[in-house]
Amino acid sequence: MFKKIATFGLSLSLAAGVLAGCGSSADETGSDASKGYEPKELTVQFVPSQSAATLEAKAKPLEELLSDELGIPVKVSVSTNYNTIIEAMASKQVDVGFLPPTAYVLAKEKGAADVILQAQRKGVNDDGSEKDELVDFYKSIFVVKNDSGIDSVADLKDKKIAFQDVTSSAGYVWPAATLMDNDLDPIKDVQGTTVKGHDQAIISLLNGDVDAAAVFQDARNIVKADYPTVFEDTKVVSFTEEIPNDTVSVRSDMTDDWKKKLQDAFIAIGKSDEGHEIIRDIYTHEGYVVSDDSNFDVVREYAEKVKTE
């Protein structure tokens, strides 16, 4: 059974339902309800794909760049988990959220967010090295130790697996679907444990706390500096299907003019040398392109597939 948190026993629809009480209680400073929301100070929040303190330190330089582009103050922070950023957007506490696909879909269903941009990343080879080409998708992988005796998804039965939050696309949803495709129930047939950050999943594996880690491809790179032999000590036993890249999403009541301003600002930052270095360091993003909600229909299909009772 899953340990640490009960949300692994919840369906994604229930995860969304938990947010149902999040009303628009915040002060609508800087907006006219009849015209839509126009921020006087922009609040931007990230989800913790790695240590929250590390991620916030990497993201803080974005404040000045965005402020210069938009002409207003900008505040950047990191949420405690995937659900809290959705809650914050639903309650009008956060204007812009860097949401992974499943979290975006949940936020959209709540009426809390609209997608404006999608990240571009460099493709990743099976050995973890980067490709030169930019892609609009990524994959999740199951990583195990070389000497584990685990050679396939089927071998994960009854094994302890490090997952991310239930709304994490690469850290839970796609891996859970892969387990199901191999006749394994992600709740009953494996021992799931939740960790905060894909780096922590790999570290837990290396420390022997878990038998496998479900992470984005290839999260081993983010711990390589501290664990130089991580690639030699581990192997990938399965790759998931493609996952749409992360979103830049905004609160749903924002005016179209401000949505366009933010699109232009993030695209410009991604093209600048300083900005590119920052966004690459945060989430391995290489730049941004305008996106549409229909790009995430496949995410809805996967979310429906992995619902549990």
Located regions from the model:
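Bilobed "Venus flytrap"/periplasmic-binding protein-like clamshell domains
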Residues: 47-68, 79, 120-121, 136-202
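Acidic, polar ligand-binding/catalytic clefts
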Residues: 87-90, 94-155
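Short beta-strand-to-loop elements that line the ligand-binding cleft
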Residues: 73-80, 95-98, 188-197, 235-238
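A ligand-binding cleft/hinge motif common to bilobed small-molecule-binding domains
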Residues: 101-112, 178-181, 206, 211-231
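An extracytoplasmic/periplasmic, membrane-proximal ligand-sensing/linker region
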Residues: 36-46, 50-70, 250, 254-309
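C-terminal motif of bacterial Sec signal peptides marking the signal peptidase cleavage site
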Residues: 17-21
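Short beta-strand->loop
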Residues: 113-135, 190-191, 224-242
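Bacterial signal peptide processing site
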Residues: 23-26
